[in-house]
Amino acid sequence: MQTDAVVLDVDGVLVDVADSYRRAVVESVDRVYGRTVPVEALQAFKDAGGFNNDWELTYAVALYVLAQREGLKIPTEEFAAHVAERGGGLDAAQSVVADMPSISQARVRDKWDRDRLREVFQALYLGSDRYRDFEGGDPPFETEGFIHDEPVILTEETAANLTDRFDVGVLTGRPSAEADVALDRVGLDVSDEHRFTMDDWEEGKPHPSALMTLAERFEAETVTFVGDTLDDIRTATNAAEADPSRSYHGVGVLTGGLTGEEGRKKYEAAGAAAVADSVNDLPALLE
């Protein structure tokens, strides 16, 4: 596959976040509401689209848990399917809950505390020291932080190969400070102008604007975007539709929530140009 520039997602591509971000989602809801969903259930929300921001994923899971308390009788996968039918993301999750009886809706809304959920999420993920550094205050409780439980996927050899052969950028839903931690850990030096984080754009994936901007900055005719979710592939296909002057390839990796043959089929159905076992297969895939 020919390309001029390679743009990398972080979570599930450069580092494994199964025991960090995803764990923080389910445990945040459990701490605040005393019940949650299995971590495996999160993939259905991710597949629904619109949950590149894990805070919003946490809020949606909390909505589902609260709705269950008020009489919602559908499994997680069915709830996520309804979310997908309504366009994905947090607004769609709220729309599904809005189909409940008005009294039940009101009870859910009264108990749904996004500020508290975010506070707990950040404390669990960052740990006490980084919470004070990044959030500018004391955490709600003391903890070491799941951020330390992110095994590196990208090898030094792969990083050197990609940066020697191509322009390399980063496009992630992480806040900037948290992206810095991951990039430092994998030893990937990417300038500010060649990366987009949660802090740099409002739309989030799968909106193509950030990927298109990186293509412009690289002056690249062909861009390959590597991610671990269907929204990453949709970002590339949306960019190809919005910017026909360039070619955009979406490559899915099987080191995130999508794995095995089922994950491969989902990527292909979403329009992936290729599916790789991991980011470390990219050097052989790209020309």
Please annotate each region the language model reported.
Residues 25, 134-141, 146-184, 198:
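Substrate-recognition element of Asp-dependent hydrolases with the DxDx(T/V) motif
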Residues 188-199, 262-287:
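Structural recognition of alpha->loop->beta junctions
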